Amino acid sequence: GRGYDPEFLTALGETEESLSAQIAEENVQALCNLLIIEFPTDEIRGEAAGLLEELYAKADYTVGAAVPPGNGSEVEITVRPVDALARVNDALWERLDAFNAGYTGDTSTDEGYAAYDAAWAEDALALFREKLAEAEYLSETVCTVTVLDGPGGTIEAGRDSLDTVYGVLFPIWMLQET
């Protein structure tokens, strides 16, 4: 588990398991949004969750020793980013254009559009699978995370610094100047 603060869980009225499940579902939805899948079925969500697990398994990082700077500790995390999401983003629109050019189904009804979206979802997930297999590691980056003592002997890290580590591990795309 993530080691959530018990007071935080109580305030939310959640258990660690239910909160972790919600976060996992939000990550699946974020992947579906990235892949432009509008109406993911349970099957598509399950496949997306499995692909995210594969992506997370590629995470490569080393956590250094804590250095006490006063009211807490700073921990350096050396991260080797994986470029899978950037590769997906780079290929997505071309893949969608090719899919649309070859799609012959009727999208004028709700049922027809749902069939289109399901077919696109399979193609988009296949693209993700392809790019995940091709993914390479980028140059190492060092991130510093401030860790504080939490209640009950737990430790806490600021959400912003953890988001920075996550963003470095899995860069989605670089904004291009126009």
Question: Which residue ranges define each predicted feature?
Answer:
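Hydrophobic membrane-targeting and insertion signals
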Residues: 1, 70, 177-178
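Beta-strand elements of well-folded, non-transmembrane domains
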Residues: 79-85, 149-151
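Mixed-charge, low-complexity intrinsically disordered segments
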Residues: 20-23, 27-35, 85-139
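Short amphipathic beta-strand and strand-loop transition segments with alternating hydrophobic
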Residues: 57-68
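Residue-level signal for tight coil/turn positions that link beta-strands
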Residues: 68-72, 151
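Core segments of small alpha/beta cavity-forming domains
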Residues: 1-58
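Short beta-strand edge/turn micro-motifs at domain boundaries
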Residues: 97-107, 111, 115, 133-178
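A short hydrophobic beta-strand element
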Residues: 71-81
